[in-house]
Amino acid sequence: MVKGIGHAAFNVKDMGRSIAFYENTMGFKKAFSIKRPETGEPWIEYIYAGGDQFIELFYGGTNEIPYSDENIGFFHMCVEVDDILEAWKRIVDTDAPQDDAPKQGVDFNWQCWTHDPDGNKIELMQLSEDGPQMKFVKSLESLE
């Protein structure tokens, strides 16, 4: 049975800069590193994202793909927060990209946007009790 999403993985150009972003701006913690078994060189940095979830950062990214809303494939990652204004303040205070300031979406949830050093779009979302996501989760809880 599926338990959830275990991780999202990204190739990164500058590991130090990426780790600093995910720790300082996003508030995650670096968990551990994995080295290449055949060479002992750094390979993957694991960022703890809460629960059983991680973000994998792979060394050696070189080919940038220009972002477009029309691209097929990865579109953005959403991070759930408990206070959207506090999350936005952290983005501003760390001089991270301020793509979209906090606003309430059509789904009644609060959202703001940034992107990581490699241009991966990140939505931060404070779920509303009136939003379809929370209503669905509550409906599942009532079945237990």
Regions found by a protein language model. Name each.
Residues F54-E56, K121:
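Short hydrophobic-acidic sequence motifs that mark active-site Asp/Glu residues
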Residues V2, A9-F54:
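Core segments of cupin and vicinal oxygen chelate
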Residues F32-S33, E41-P42, T62-Y67, D100, ...:
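A short, acidic/glycine-rich surface segment
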Residues Y59-N63, Q126-L127:
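Acetyl-CoA-dependent GNAT
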Residues G4-K13, W43-A49, I65-E144, ...:
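Vicinal oxygen chelate
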Residues M1-R17, F74-V79, S128-E144:
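N-terminal beta-strand motif that seeds the catalytic metal site of vicinal oxygen chelate
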